[in-house]
Amino acid sequence: METNDRQKSWLKVWGGRLLNMIFFFCMLFVVYLVSGVFIVTSFKIPSDSMEPSLQTGDCILVDKCSKGARLFDVFAALEKKEVKIHRMPGWRKFNRNDVLVFNFPYPGRWDSIAFDVMSYYVKRCIAVPGDTLEIKDCHYRVKGHDGYLGNTAAQDKLQKLLDSEEFVNRGIVVESYPFDKELGWSIAEFGPLYIPAKGSVVEMDSLNRMLYRNLIEWEQKEKLTFRRDTVLLGDSVISRYCFRENYYFVSGDKMENSKDSRYWGLLPEPFIVGRALRIWKSKDDRSGSIKWGRVWKKIE
């Protein structure tokens, strides 16, 4: 009888401890999920397009909450269905020179924007909603902004490359968005390009039709067509357009090897995951060793 009582007591004690451990790990998992969705998440850098700021093998922490975390139907997005993206309230805007992680807006084809939840890029924000951007001699310029924009050393280097014949050997594509021969924009001479802000209005002249066609079709889920001097959105004639979303111009820091807004156009705000903060781990892909000098480095 005494032995049975001891066994029951032992089972009660250890059963309680086991339940507490299970509860603890369940709560830990819930905290991990909630923080990953609403607060901060991690991404691994797959390429050298953001060197020297970010290197291949860097694992970065991305702030989701300051601008507001995104909410959408993940399962529908994984099935590549159209999803409505909502953003929670935040206390900070995305600013020029922020390093942003986002879903690449052209995962399938270059003439239409689509949301691919599994396709992520990281680039530096050069121009924000309401800005007017130009590229002069490979250097970024924003009207009314006197500070630096992007990696100025890389802009100097690209200018020298384009002044020589070396860019041909490196396979650098000089032509840029919107790839119109008459307009003649390039990665050396580009713009001026107005970066649409939510609520801003543009006239539907021949230039704006070309520059903003993909954005308008994505917002409206209607085709933009032209009949002589008439612009049709679906079956409706329009002479101007009011944007529903904010947009950004982004660029890689390694400008001679980065496919960014110079080539594919503007980034819709709903596609932005958040702002890169720090490198929490960095691993050499060849040797497998940790790059301790880069661990916990602030991303600037």
Segments (PLM) and residue ranges:
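Hydrophobic membrane-insertion alpha-helices, especially the h-region
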Residues: 19-38
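Cytochrome P450 fold signature focused on the C-terminal beta-domain
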Residues: 41-42, 127
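N-terminal signal-anchor transmembrane helix
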Residues: 42-53
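Soluble "head" domains of membrane/secretory-pathway proteins
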Residues: 2-15, 51-300
